[in-house]
Amino acid sequence: AHCEIDVAVCYYGVGIEEDLELRERITCPLVMHFAELDQFVPEEARQKVSKAFEQRPDVEIYTYPGTDHAFNTPGRDSYDKPAAQMAHSRSIAAFRRALGPHHNLSELWDTHCYHEFVTRDVNATMATMVSEPYVNHIPTMTGGVGYDHLKRFYTHHFVNNNPDDTKLIPVSRTIGSDRVVDEMVFCFTHTREIDWMLPGIEPTGKYVEVPLVAIVCFRGD
């Protein structure tokens, strides 16, 4: 981190507490990920590191509760997927702040929703996604994994299956480095059966408002 690079990310940080006299040579943004139960970096060592960098706003230090050494390594017994994913998001945020690219994730998500609910164009909707997308509507466990399965779902059960007056009322939107969490109210008149939301329920003709939370992850460049 003191070799004139733009940004550095550190996992586990074994032995860092023994070389803290070199910290002034670190001039780039730095993110450190520690495991709470790591015997190689006990709490005392982590506290020394945190104390040494407490006046550095460009240094972020995270400890992941209940995790052990190598929590970020798939295939290891200590692998912890939730912690690894969170660490990945924080690392990506640091890299993008320093190096880019800088995407407008909110705009990308709006474009996706526009083609889902306004133009109702399956091909245009699919074009906003990665080559191997994944969608899961948790309450009914509907969606698709992979391009072909998801396109089939969108074509026969989603994009062309929503009532004509369907609309989204935004409530709150949280934007991270690699995801958007969108809270909204999904509004429609129940004029047709909606497979992905109310499967098996014949149209009632009633106006319906359903609160929804969409967690949208972004991959690639």
For each of these PLM feature ranges, what is it?
Residues 53-72:
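Catalytic histidine neighborhood in serine/cysteine hydrolases
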Residues 36, 69-72, 76-220:
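C-terminal and inter-domain tail/linker signature
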Residues 1-27:
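Primarily recognizes the serine-hydrolase "nucleophile elbow" in alpha/beta-hydrolase
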Residues 12, 34-36:
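N-terminal Rossmann-fold cofactor-binding loop
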Residues 42-52:
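Short alpha-helix in the alpha/beta-hydrolase fold that links the catalytic acid
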Residues 5, 28-29, 55-58:
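A short helix->loop->beta-strand "cap" motif at the edges of active sites that frequently abuts
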Residues 26, 31-34, 64:
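Short beta-strand/loop motif that positions the catalytic acidic residue
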Residues 37-41:
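Acidic catalytic loop of the alpha/beta-hydrolase fold
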